[in-house]
Regions:
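Active-site loop->helix "elbow" adjoining a glycine-rich segment at hydrolase catalytic centers
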Residues: 7-10, 20
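Alpha/beta-hydrolase fold nucleophile elbow
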Residues: 1-7
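Conserved alpha/beta-hydrolase catalytic His-Asp/Glu region
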Residues: 38-40, 58-115
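Short alpha-helix in the alpha/beta-hydrolase fold that links the catalytic acid
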Residues: 112, 121, 135-144
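Short beta-strand/loop motif that positions the catalytic acidic residue
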Residues: 119, 125-127, 131
């Protein structure tokens, strides 16, 4: 099977690929990392502190704007306003706040830095030049540790590349997933 993971989903995909190498044909890791750095842990602590206030608006304002590039956020102001109208009520629900805290806490001690080299399947690592949540340096670490991995940067995009540049993101994912096991032949 081919597996793709974005951000936290990439962490899950890494763990699955390491533990089940015989089940993964191709792996795509987008805007993710091999470990939760101290810096990222502090960001998560901040998100949890805001979630504990019960304010969906405060949670939205703390977590959502930073996942987009500044250019996208400003260019797509109307779209962002619609997202805000949907997400603030959602983030205001106590059950959602509890689940967001559990999600953040579940990656607190995540560290596969010493195991990602065990990934042997063809792997595509997608980075984004404007990702300030999981910066490109984290994907470079993955690329250096996963032998034979391919590395690509989506320029101008932030952490939410699937929204910011869906054409590039989709082309990369589908192109890599559907690539012949024999590679590219001309």
């Amino acid at each position: 099977m081919s597996i793709m993971g974005i951000s936290y989903g990439g962490e899950v995909a890494i763990q699955f690929a390491v533990k089940n190498p015989d089940k993964v044909r191709r792996l795509i890791l987008a805007n993710t990392c091999a470990r939760t750095s101290d810096w990222l842990r502090k960001i998560g602590d901040g998100w949890n502190a805001v979630a504990k206030t019960g304010s969906g608006e405060a949670y939205y304002l703390t977590t959502i704007p930073v996942i987009y590039s500044t250019a996208f956020y400003e260019r797509e102001a109307a779209w962002m306003e619609k997202r805000e109208g949907v997400l603030i009520p959602y983030f205001s629900r106590p059950d959602v706040q509890e689940s967001l805290i559990r999600l953040t806490d579940s990656s607190r001690d995540y560290d596969y830095t010493d195991r990602v080299h065990e990934i042997t399947c063809p792997t595509l690592i997608i980075s984004c030049s404007e990702d300030c949540l999981v910066p490109p340096t984290e994907q470079v670490i993955l690329h250096q540790k996963i032998k034979g991995s391919a590395y690509v940067t989506i320029n101008g995009s932030g952490h939410a590349s699937m929204y910011e540049d869906p054409a590039s993101f989709t082309a990369l994912v589908l192109g890599f997933t559907n690539l012949s096991d024999d590679g590219i032949k001309i």
